[in-house]
Amino acid sequence: MEFSARERLIALIGVLFLFDGAFLLDIPVVREVLGAVVLAVIPGMLILSIFRPGKITLLEYVLLAVGVSLAVLMIGGLLYNNLLLYLGILKPFSGRLLLDCYNVMILALAAVWYLTNKGTSFYLPDPSIKAADAVLLLPALVFLPLSAFAMHLINTTGNNTLLIGLFFAILVYIGALCICHARASPWIMPAALLIMSVTLILPLALRSNYIIGTDTHFEYFTFISTLNNGYWSIIGSAQLDSCLSISILPVFFQIFTGISPMMLFKVIFALIFAISPLIIYSIAKQYLNEIYAFLAAAFFMIQPQFMTATSNSRTVLALLFFMLTVMLLLKEEGMNPLRKKALIVLFIAAAIFSHYTTSFIFFGILVFAWVGTGILSLKYPVRPAPSVDILVIFLALMYVWYALVTVVPSQMFVGFVEKTAENLDQFLMPETRGQDVQRLFGAHLPDKGLPYIIQFVLSWASIGLIAIGTLAMILDRKKTVLPGKEKAEYLKKKFSGLFFVLVITVTGLLGLMIIVPYLSDGYDLARVLPICNTILSVMFVVGGIAIAETLRFVIRYPGERRKREYLTSLPAGQSQLMKMSLAVILLVLLPYFLSATGVLHTLSGDNRDVVFHADGPQYDMKYIHDTEARGAAWLKQRMEPDVRVFADGFGVSRLMSLGTIPHSSLASFVQYGWVSRESYIYLRYKNVVDGNLIDFDGKYRDLDEFAQIFRHKDKVYSNGGSSIWTE
């Protein structure tokens, strides 16, 4: 289908007109859908069309358009906020004013785009669907409504059978795609990935009507404060105020879509991050067959860190920009170098404005990549990447934003480095490592039961595949990386020198997280893994292929074990290699999927996961009841200013999101062991119903241990699931 520039301009203005009408009349569904499209897609599409970065695939175009849109909203929103405040407008983020200014920006971009693309046409692929494509895609289309209905059942009846069945259906679907992939059109794999991605990432977001997580309560407070104030500024925790991903960005989406703030904050980041497996697919497809790229993306998608993205809002946005940057850096052909560099700088700036720690790690990876490719360039025709000017800009932006403007993130980083250095003499003490590292090496494993032992084995099986893939790439580097005519049969093209160095770099980063004392205690290994898996997901698949190559060699050619090259030229051998590779990869991937999602634990009677259960530690700590929300709202309305509120650790976080009470007015009486005379005590559901307290350390304590703090307090509010005490 062909569309002229004029037709596209008319369509764009039509969409904008429809959205404005839906916004002003508050038309349900239309406002929500068009608001999301107008914000998350249109700015990036216009900028890319004006910018013309070069030859990119449709998938890359869509991914870059979303990334550019989000980056422009954050960076442009900050400039807009500061400019209007300077002009004396006290609430830049008010509905009609923001809509008018946004319309002007979009129309200006549209005018520039039309003038620069007046004589061009746009071609869409043939929309017809083959019968085989329909058969492969239709089952996946059922996943999304099933996911929503399954969570409705769990929230209302506690029945998790449908959700377990859904996860088994996804497992079968992945296997079916691997079997039938040769019959599918090229677009089926990314479409299936996106549907499964949203299906897996939504359950936690839909688990209750309120925020689920720990840090996410603090992040929500930053967002709701910006929304209520009508402007952005450093108002509370500078480390959170420095993250525009949880302040300015969700404010745009809330004002434009009209979705309730808490529901929007729970869902929007999950939906945005759902495109991340497609970035993995795009990266992997440069080097591997489509089905291998699909499995690399699937491996990234079934990680626990991916499925809990809704509780790590600022981290996942920074990670998304890191992934887009890596995708651009690894794309060596077809793009204009200067325009590619401009996009990289934009995504780097967006990552800096999203999350400080991820940005520090991001910068470190790029520095080591530059050093590594520089060393390779001394002997091989490899260009050092990224370029020095990108690193200088990255460092300068971090210094300005973290050291001069918001200050606290740089102070935290320096303190973290100093504390890590102070703990180097405790190298042999396991307790100086974080809980994630201790679990990785089986701490307390015999006491936990069979599902945890199986998860431990499967985790190490996946690590084993990654290690084998990395070693195979290094040992067979003449066929996998280094310039020359010889190429491994499973590769479409050889891995670039930059990719090779990135694999070594992120592997080294994981090694440091495990080896260096305090490093994983100060910053969880679980937060670093998604960054590393951006690259290592490809190595997971390569590891499966390497094992299959060895098995094929041993089984089929026992007499030619020293002549490996004999195997690589036969089409039948290549087909056999793919079948064996898929079998090896699925043998690890599918059981690991059941373990990572919590299905295995649930079937064995373990109530670990809040998504499946209405009891257990996660539920006690993170699930919010309606009674707790009503109690927090009552307290917010009636509490006197400058009077402190005490609660247990997870009660403190609830009061920030449910009552929008600043952290400076909150404290844990469990941590301090006392309360001030003029103060409030807030007891949540677990405290009132079960008589248990849970502080920031996750340990359970009896409420009776703190009976003395209620001696001079009276109960002034109770609803059966929360209570409030004061003088």
State each model region's role.
Residues 36, 43, 162-170, 315, ...:
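Hydrophobic/aromatic-rich transmembrane helices and adjacent perimembrane loops
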Residues 1-186:
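Membrane-embedded, hydrophobic transmembrane alpha-helices
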Residues 29, 35-38, 155-162, 177-320, ...:
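Active-site lumenal/periplasmic loops and adjacent helix-entry segments of GT-C-fold
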Residues 270-271, 286, 298-299, 315, ...:
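Extracytoplasmic
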Residues 2, 6-18, 141, 190-198, ...:
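Transmembrane alpha-helix segments characteristic
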Residues 25-26, 98-105, 213-216, 312-318, ...:
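Transmembrane catalytic cores of multi-pass membrane glycosyltransferases
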Residues 173-177, 370, 452-493:
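Hydrophobic, aromatic-rich transmembrane alpha-helices
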Residues 66-77, 81, 105-106, 144-146, ...:
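Membrane-embedded helix bundles of polyisoprenyl
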